[in-house]
Amino acid sequence: MSQELNSMFSPHSRLRHAVADTFAMVVYCSVVGMMIEIFVSGMSFEQSLSSRLVAIPVNMVIAWPYGLYRDAVMRLAARVGKGRLVRNLADVIAYITFQSPVYAAILLFVGADIPQIITAVSSNIVVSMMMGAAYGYFLDYCRRLFRVSPAAPVSAQA
């Protein structure tokens, strides 16, 4: 039992890694998504709130897979170079290629029409590019808060 608890709270714990990634995604996507939907896409506050509420459980399900996907993209990018530009570009590519299809499905589910979906997803892509690797930095910050090991080598325990 003691070993199980120690491994659960280890910096290499899958549970700790998943919780950190989930926290980061729910917070970031709620704030940024609502701003884009209301101020750029022209969605009503009610539509955006519905979208964000639907997105929370979706983000909880996809957060850790996204974190693993991002880590894989970052490892591939590290083969190209170690500089900040390569890292930022890899973060943007990982975020856009993983999140855009999920975001479009959420908007469709909450009743946004096709032009709103196209505008919101396109705007999200542009904003993601303009903000650089903001989510990647936020994710890394949350992982540090949760004391998850950098580059997240995940153990087989808990």
UniProtKB/Swiss-Prot annotation:
It comes from Cronobacter sakazakii (strain ATCC BAA-894) (Enterobacter sakazakii). GO terms for cellular component: plasma membrane. Belongs to the AlaE exporter family. This is L-alanine exporter AlaE. The chain crosses the membrane at residues 23-43, 53-73, 92-112, 117-137. It is a multi-pass membrane protein. It is found in: Cell inner membrane. GO terms for biological process: amino acid export across plasma membrane. It comes from the Bacteria. InterPro entries: Ala_export_AlaE (IPR010574). The lineage of its organism: Bacteria, Pseudomonadati, Pseudomonadota, Gammaproteobacteria, Enterobacterales. Exports L-alanine. It holds the Pfam family AlaE. Keywords: Amino-acid transport, Cell inner membrane, Cell membrane, Membrane, Transmembrane, Transmembrane helix, Transport. GO terms for molecular function: L-amino acid efflux transmembrane transporter activity.
